[in-house]
Amino acid sequence: MNTPFLIIADDLSGAADCAVGFALAGLDSTVLLGCDVSPGLQATVLTVDTDSRRDAAEVAAGKARAALDRHGAGRAVIKKIDSTLRGGWVAEVAALQPALGMALVAAAFPELGRVMRDGLLYVHGQRLADTATWQLEHAGREDRPAVQLRQAGLRCEVLPSTLLDGDAAAVQQAVARAITLAWTQGCQALVFDVEQTHHLRQLARATHALTGIFWVGSGGLSRELAAALPAAGARAAASVPTAGPDIAPAWSSTGTAESPGHTVLTVAGSLSPMTRQQIACMATDTRTRVHTIAAAELRQAPGADLSLIHI
């Protein structure tokens, strides 16, 4: 039986990113836009967008706890956070910890150039506190995750990335010992140094079956947790159609304007510069049609239900 998950995210793009990772691993995933929305069908992976990225810390914490209270029964929990530590994630973790146990924190996302070394987050080699974004939004504020958690009242330690090096069995034992020791010493949160994607993968594989813990991390950790679930690879492979020797797959690029084959609908709702670049790149293909739709038009559409997305 698949482990049911609750993912609590503070914005929609992060919520969708995590949900898609589990969907690609073969698990049915639903995204709820708000804590009070009913999921309808009971999905294996339930992701709640609390829309709290810009809320005050106490408001964000209240939304996270409300999501847990309403949807968390019987589910392993991931608190999705931004890989550059935006939002009220510290208050959210502090609100969730008493109910869930040890927080395993891995904010790094090496594929995007965000790594954790000696308890410090680096963005493309630059310490987070020195980046233009941090200077603009958080100048003078603490950027070390462990220190932030301690300031919120949680007892926290940092574990080195070397703990995640080695063969999987040895890493699993080492991580389990570290968590047990930290817990017996009264620790409530562990921040993991992560410098490479394989560190995230090792952490996910070593902890996916543990109880009395919850994960705090970016989309990178969520993706590795999805892949670490038993038979996830087999489920994902089984869900991808294969072509016979004389049959082109549905997504074949051999289609023409006269015989286009399947049409792909891409919906982009992010304001990030990277998303804009991706849209511009797609628009250079003569087969692509780009339509810009104002959010107000979607909200006013007759019969529109914007509270639930099933993936």
Named regions from a protein language model:
Residues 2-5, 29-32, 44, 55-77, ...:
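Cap/lid and interdomain-hinge subdomains that line or gate substrate/regulatory clefts
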Residues 45-51:
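A structural-propensity feature for long, helix-poor, extended segments
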